[in-house]
């Protein structure tokens, strides 16, 4: 029986990878040849279950997912990411969501963020202002749609739109 389990598992793995959507990470905001996401910040740490605070990940706790390297502050966050990576990946390839509305790829301040509708939105904050505060003044859903549409034009990727379970009171954004 064990001899048959191995080939079946291998077939399942091949089948899953054949059906997985192919994405090009060439348009993503990634640092260096290691293709590091979010300047090395832990993507799970932004979400309530990871503490809700931007936290630098460790060089010793990393995951390479679909060509992108993520760092994690601890094994618990790494394991949460491995269970559902799409949930924790930043919107718009890790570029500033405000600028992406116009199709512009603008670098981010990893500490300027909003988690809303179960998605991580990152923003520019620097000499030219704080784009997160501009985003907050508008209609989040409309701005997210604009940025998602522009991201599709820039990257060819369809943005993930996942709403949290339960009522809208649970969808309260985490921000800093």
Task: Kindly give the residue locations of the regions a language model identified.
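C-terminal segment of classical bacterial N-terminal signal peptides
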Residues: 1-4
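Charged, low-complexity intrinsically disordered segments
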Residues: 6-176
């Amino acid at each position: 029986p064990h001899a048959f389990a191995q080939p079946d598992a291998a077939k399942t793995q091949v089948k899953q990878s054949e059906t997985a959507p192919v994405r090009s990470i060439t348009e993503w905001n990634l640092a260096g040849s290691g293709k590091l996401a979010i300047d090395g910040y832990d993507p799970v740490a932004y979400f309530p279950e990871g503490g809700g605070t931007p936290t630098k990940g460790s060089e010793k706790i990393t995951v390479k997912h679909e060509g992108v390297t993520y760092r994690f502050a601890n094994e618990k966050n790494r394991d949460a990411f491995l269970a559902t990576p799409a949930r924790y990946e930043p919107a718009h390839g890790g570029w500033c969501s405000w600028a992406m509305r116009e199709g512009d790829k603008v670098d981010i301040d990893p500490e300027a963020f909003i988690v809303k509708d179960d998605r991580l939105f990152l923003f520019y904050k620097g000499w030219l202002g704080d784009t997160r505060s501009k985003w907050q003044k508008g209609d989040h859903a409309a701005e997210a749609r604009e940025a998602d549409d522009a991201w599709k034009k820039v990257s060819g990727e369809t943005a993930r739109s996942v709403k949290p379970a339960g009522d809208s009171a649970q969808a309260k954004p985490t921000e800093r």
